Amino acid sequence: MSPFSLLILVICAFSLFFLINLSRGLSILLVFTKNQLLALLLLSIVSLFSISLISALIFFDLLPSTFFGFILLLFF
């Protein structure tokens, strides 16, 4: 594993931890707020952002490997 891959995994882990804590706080906000539509919108944006960030980091980490190319050949 290269140092760049390790750095990407560390950034991914910390960003996932941060976004999970943020979404937990937003779900608590959803319970106690009067404008629930805005809180629900914020919660969905944070969730979609975290999923897309993790997917992109995994994709770019696996892109150079030959195993990933083999998987692409199998599914496409």
Swiss-Prot record:
GO terms for cellular component: membrane. Keywords: Membrane, Signal, Transmembrane, Transmembrane helix. Residues 26-34 are extracellular. The chain crosses the membrane at residues 35-55. Disruption phenotype: Homozygous mice have tremors and a propensity to develop spastic movements upon handling. It is found in: Membrane. The keyword Signal applies. The keyword S-adenosyl-L-methionine does not apply. Residues 56-76 are cytoplasmic. Coiled coil: none annotated. Residues 1-25 form the signal peptide. It is a single-pass type I membrane protein. This is KANTR integral membrane protein. It comes from Mus musculus. The lineage of its organism: Eukaryota, Metazoa, Chordata, Craniata, Vertebrata.
